[in-house]
Amino acid sequence: NQKVAFNVAEEDMSIIGEEAFMNPVNSEEFTVGYYLNTKLGEFDVDFGVRLDDITRNGSVAEEHHDEDEGEEHEEEVELYDLNFSTQSYAIQFSQDWTDNLTVSLALSNVERAPGAQELFMNGPHLVTNRFEVGDVNLGTEVSNNIDFTMNYENDGAFASASFYANAVDNYIYLMDESEADHEEHEDEDHEEHHGDMIRANYLQQDAEFNGYELLVGRTITLPNGNLTVSLGQDSVIGKFNADSADESYVPRLTPKRTFIDVDYSSADYSAGISFKDVKPQYKTAMEESSTEGFMLVDMKVAKEFALSQDVGMTVSFFAKNLMDERARNHTSFVKNQVPLAGRNIGFKFNITF
């Protein structure tokens, strides 16, 4: 089984209005991809290669202040024509060790060109409450990845385990400035543009990520339906390399999470309850605050009704965050200002015809 794909795309990105933090950017992309699936002895082999040629045309505006207060600010616009050529490869070996157990090993080298926002942002972004500053000198991000996965199924029981390690050269991330940098910008009279917003810069450093995803469960057949119970957990740790300028953790890492789900379904009725235990996140980057853990409990019940031969209605009841936990999402830029929603309960009515 072989496939060849070609893709040509052009994108014009323009942010206008009060939140105009980036000048218009034109991007042109040309992609060639090849995919192969074959047998190699006892292994199923999947191989893919992708070549991208990306051009981004944009500009960055900067206001210059005259010493005389009566003079208007002069805006200087610098134009950029940036080109990136990337190559990505991936190969996966899979084998059925038994009738119930499948094991796979995947290796990949993935190159990613910087996005338009990472290159050309230069202004207040209200969603993140940051004054974001891109960098037109960012280079291609290169990731070397290894993934090992096991999947098991037998008589209603199922389990999966996935472990991965990623070494990323020139990892691109958005980092809040330090207090010292903030004071320096204040001295440069940039406070007028930042206001109360935190200045954040797009930077690059080598980083390493290691993590896992685990899931185990069972589906039980009952007289009138099926009951499925599952337990899962995931975790990831990302650190900048020891030889990088910053040896701290990568910002906004997802904390360790444990999931428990109980679901029942029949021909016209379904119900479920889920528990999500999110651990505290103390593995933080410089200038980043830690986040406390929390437990979320959600439930849902749905019933289907036949109103006529061709018309059906589904009535759903949902309740989210039943314990009314005060929870904050560590991966959010505004976690300290905006917590997750508290307890909310409601009904949904869906009619199909």
Short names for language-model regions:
Residues 1, 37-44, 95-99, 142, ...:
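Outer-membrane beta-barrel strand-turn architecture
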Residues 1, 32-38, 91-95, 138, ...:
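Residues on the lipid-exposed face of transmembrane beta-strands in outer-membrane beta-barrel proteins
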Residues 164-168, 185-284, 323:
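Gram-negative outer-membrane beta-barrel transporters
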Residues 8-14, 40-42, 51-57, 107-113, ...:
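Transmembrane beta-strands of outer-membrane beta-barrel pores
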Residues 102-108, 112-118, 139-202, 208-210:
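Membrane-embedded beta-barrel scaffold of Gram-negative outer-membrane proteins
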Residues 169, 279-283, 303-353:
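C-terminal beta-signal and adjacent terminal beta-strands/loops
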Residues 1-72, 76-96, 102-104, 108, ...:
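Face-selective signature of the C-terminal outer-membrane beta-barrel domain
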